Design a protein with these regions (language model features):
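An N-terminal structural lobe/cap that precedes and organizes the functional/catalytic core
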Residues: 1-54
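C-terminal, well-folded lobe of enzymatic/effector domains
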Residues: 56-200
Length: 200
């Protein structure tokens, strides 16, 4: 939750990060140097301007260079999604189609598991920040976790910087190529009282 980026009524995406079955992260430089594409924006635009526009809206870089951010996420994480390896597509594989599938799957998950709407359904909405002051209006970690558990049956991990909400991590397992379903978190939270402030 970055108050400087994305729609005022939506969480933006950081990525979809595959882990090993025992919860360990995969190599930091990705899993397939042959597919370490650097022109993600061009690949997506060539396939779907609608997807590209949605990525610009819901997956912006907080450093201002979306293509660099998407390339980083693809190389480090996308190349490690085993179900997106070209051999999984069979004889009908078209070069780079797995890139489009990776990003479109993530945006579908973002829409299906809409954190903003799930929190709002439990009465948890962003509050107006007070300039130069510590946030007074806060929610508890238990409130956040309960709201999202009510929506999807499992709790997330909630991450803060100080008291300010930074990220909500959802954990999934996958059946086949794209049947993702939420599961209990394997990580830890870094919040107690949460300042969930309006975007500006």
């Amino acid at each position: 939750w970055d108050t400087r980026w994305g729609p005022s009524d939506a969480f933006t995406v950081h990525g979809l990060w595959p882990d090993t079955c025992d919860g360990k992260m995969l190599p930091s430089n990705g899993c397939d140097p042959q597919r370490a594409y650097t022109n993600i924006s061009s690949i997506i635009r060539a396939d779907s301007m609608e997807l590209h526009d949605n990525m610009n809206t819901y997956w912006p870089s907080n450093k201002g260079d979306n293509n660099w951010f998407w390339t980083h996420e693809w190389v480090k994480h996308g190349t490690c999604v085993s179900t997106l390896e070209p051999r999984c597509y069979g004889t009908g594989y078209t070069s780079q189609e797995e890139v489009v599938d990776y990003f479109s799957t993530i945006l579908k998950l973002r829409a299906k598991y809409d954190i903003y709407k799930a929190l709002a359904a439990s009465g948890i909405t962003p509050t107006k920040p007070e300039a130069g002051r510590r946030p007074k209006n806060t929610y508890t970690l238990a409130q956040f976790k309960a709201a999202l558990k009510d929506a999807w049956g499992v709790e997330p991990n909630v991450k803060c910087r100080g008291r300010r909400l930074q990220e909500v991590w959802l954990w999934f397992k996958v059946r086949g190529r794209d049947d993702y379903y939420p599961v209990a978190p394997w990580g830890s939270d870094s919040c107690y009282r949460i300042a969930y402030e309006q975007k500006h």
